[in-house]
Amino acid sequence: MPKTTHFAPETCTLCPRQCRADRAAGRIGFCGAGGALKAARAALHFWEEPCISGTRGSGTVFFSGCTLKCCFCQNYPISAEGLGKEISVGHLAEIFLDLQAQGAHNINLVTPGQWQPWIIAALDLARAQGLHLPIVCNTGGYETLESIERWRGYIDIWLADLKYVSPALSAELSAAPDYFAVARPGIDAMMAQAGHPVFDADGILQKGVILRHLALPGHVDDSFAVLDQMAAWNRADPGCFLPSVMSQYTPFYKAADHGIGRRITTYEYRRVVNYAMDLGLSDGYMQQKSSAKEEYTPSFDLTGV
C-alpha cells in the first residue's frame, strides 16, 4: 500500500469526507475503498467528448468506489456496490501501457480520487517504461484542494463535473450538502493548474479543463445557477475551459426514490441549452437530446483488468 508524506493509510483524508478510515487495516471508507486497489474495466471508450475520444478512443480505466453518493449514478455497480477486481500497482502500470499500445489518444482515469497514491505510483512506473499519453482525470468535481495539488505533474486534462449549486439538492441527490462549496474552489485550482485548452493537429485535447453539467429532470433552475457560475469563470478569463452540457440523464439506481425517476424532457433541455448560449457558453459541447440511452453506459465485466 502506498504511503507518502501526503497520505497516511491508517487515517485516510484523501477526499472532502475526511472519514479517516484505517485503510491499512482494510477498513472501508465512505467512498467504498479499502486497502487493495480495485478497478472494473479498462478499455478504449468512444463516448466522451470528441476531443477526448477522437477516432481511436480514450484509454479509460474505471475505478471502484466513489466519494459521492449520487442516487442516479449510471456506474452504480462500481461506484456504490463495490464491483471490481483487486489489482496491483504494477498491473495498473501494465494496463496503462497496454491501452497506449492499442492506440488510445489518452489515459482516462474515471473516479480516481480514492486511489490517488496507488495511481500516482502506477503512473511513475508506466512513464519509466514509455507511457507518454496525456492523462485525464474524470471526476465528479468533489475534490480537496490538497488532492488537486498532489495531481500536479500527473494530470494534463481535467474532465470535471459541476453538478449542482443548491446545497439542498446536492444533499438530496449526492449526500453532499457542501458540494458547490468544495467544487467551486476546486475547479478554480484545476483551471489554474491545467491552463487554457491546447489541442494537437488532429483536434485532440492535450491539456486543459472540460467542465461538464448533466441537466436533471425537474431541476432546470439549478442548471441555470450552474451555468451562471460557468459564465462567470468565462467572463473572468475567456476560454479558460470547454463547457459540456449533457442531456444523457437516465434514471438509474435509486433515482425514482428521489423525485427524478424520468428522463429530461426536450423542453427542459432546450431551456438549459438556450440559457447556456445566451450566456456565451458556445465554445464547447451541447449533447443531443437523443443521447439519453443506456448504451452510453459500459459493461462492467472486468474487461482489461
Where are these regions (language model features)?
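Auxiliary Fe-S-binding modules of radical SAM enzymes
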Residues: 1-27, 196-305
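Conserved Radical SAM active-site core
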Residues: 27, 31-153, 157, 166-167
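Hydrophobic faces of well-ordered beta-strands that scaffold small-molecule active sites
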Residues: 59, 107, 135-137, 158-160, ...
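Conserved radical SAM core fold
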Residues: 79, 116, 141-144, 162-180, ...
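Alpha-helix N-cap and loop-to-helix initiation/capping positions
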Residues: 87, 114, 174-182, 260-267
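Alpha-helix-loop-beta-strand connector modules within alpha/beta enzyme cores
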Residues: 123-134, 185-193, 266-274
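Non-cysteine beta-strand/loop elements that form the S-adenosyl-L-methionine
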Residues: 152-169, 240-248
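Anionic-ligand binding region
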Residues: 171-202
